Amino acid sequence: MKKLLCAASFGIALAFSVGAQAADKIAVVNVGEIFQQLPAREAVVKQLENEFKNRASELQRMETDLQSKIQKLQRDGSTMKSSERTNLEKEVMAKREEFAKKAQAFEQDHRRREMEERNKILSRIQDAIKVVAGKEGYDVVIDANAVAYSVSGKNITTSVLKQVK
């Protein structure tokens, strides 16, 4: 009898807990759309272009210089003295390695800075989502890309976009 009473009370408690979970207010937000529509994103792109402009032009200059030396080697290599040809080949190899190192460092630095700025913007979006969810009384907010179906009335993307701007 005691076991039956315990099992029945456990079943009732389980039924009520499922009902309580269903009462959560859930909203959907499209973070990617907000990110694309922010004016701050375009400002960051221009800022990064200005920040890396000098290094990019230096890499272009190095590439042009390297290409001219390679063309000279291909064009005049057969008529050069062997010592001149060897020196030019060594110079081309050294410049090619230097260019590759600088290009790789440039790409890594650019990617790192891009991620830093992207994370700042995403942090602002996350803060705005928390504010809007708190104002409108939502318990759970899910990214629209992770949802197969949602009711359009539960989409808070425009409210979050207004909050971020």
UniProtKB/Swiss-Prot annotation:
Region (Lipopolysaccharide binding): 102-113
GO MF entries: unfolded protein binding
Gene3D superfamilies (alphabetical): Skp domain
Subcellular localization, as worded in the UniProt entry: Periplasm
Keyword flag Chaperone: yes
Cellular component GO terms held in the UniProt record: cytosol; periplasmic space
Keywords, alphabetical: Chaperone, Periplasm, Signal
Signal peptide, first to last residue: 1-22
UniProt superkingdom: Bacteria
Record GO biological process: chaperone-mediated protein folding; protein stabilization
Family to which the UniProt record says this protein belongs: Belongs to the Skp family.
Function summary: Molecular chaperone that interacts specifically with outer membrane proteins, thus maintaining the solubility of early folding intermediates during passage through the periplasm.
Oligomer status and interactors: Homotrimer.
Name under which the protein is recorded: Chaperone protein Skp
Gene that encodes the chain: skp
